[in-house]
Amino acid sequence: ADQFGFNEDQREQMAELLADENNSLWSQVLYGITGGDGEIVTVALSQVGNVGGEPYWSWYGFSSRVEWCACFVSWCADQCGYIEAGVIPKFAACASQGVPWFQERGLWQDNSYEPRPGDIIFFDWDDGGQDGQSDHVGIVEKVENGRVYTVEGNSGDSVRQNSYPIGYYEIYGYGTPAY
């Protein structure tokens, strides 16, 4: 504010606009995100382009690189306070930790579900045959025209935006956090 020469009234207005309770408004303005939870999507989008995932796997507690897609989702959730609040689990493994957590709480939908922003999308990649176990995870950014748009960590060893048709055979299902 100093570098722009804001007066006291302008500083107060800026502080009001940037207050936490306006995060969903800014998600709508900046990213077109409505419904669901825009806060975790905003955090995830801010990380697009990261290569190697070091901030996420090291935050989780690993001392060297691991398959870090779940660490990325957990890190984003932690930035929003969702792990501490019990809204999303801290997990590093999709099949043994992430999926069961949502299923046990009745917060699970199969791949025919039309997701909302902030839902957690799990995949069962067809790399040598699907095994009925989730092996990748991301965050739903939005749904438009029958496609689900995602932000995924460890997608080609970076944070990337991707999209898939709703009901795509490699989508294992969705965790639907109770935001």
Residue ranges and their predicted role:
Residues 22-82:
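N-terminal capping segments
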Residues 56, 72, 122, 173-174:
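Aromatic-residue hotspot detector
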Residues 17, 43-47, 101:
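Residues that form generic nucleotide/phosphate-binding pockets
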Residues 1-30:
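Non-catalytic extracellular/periplasmic "stalk"
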Residues 83-157:
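...with weaker cross-activation on analogous glycine-rich loops/strands in unrelated enzymes
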Residues 12, 35-42, 96, 100, ...:
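Generic alpha-helical secondary structure signal
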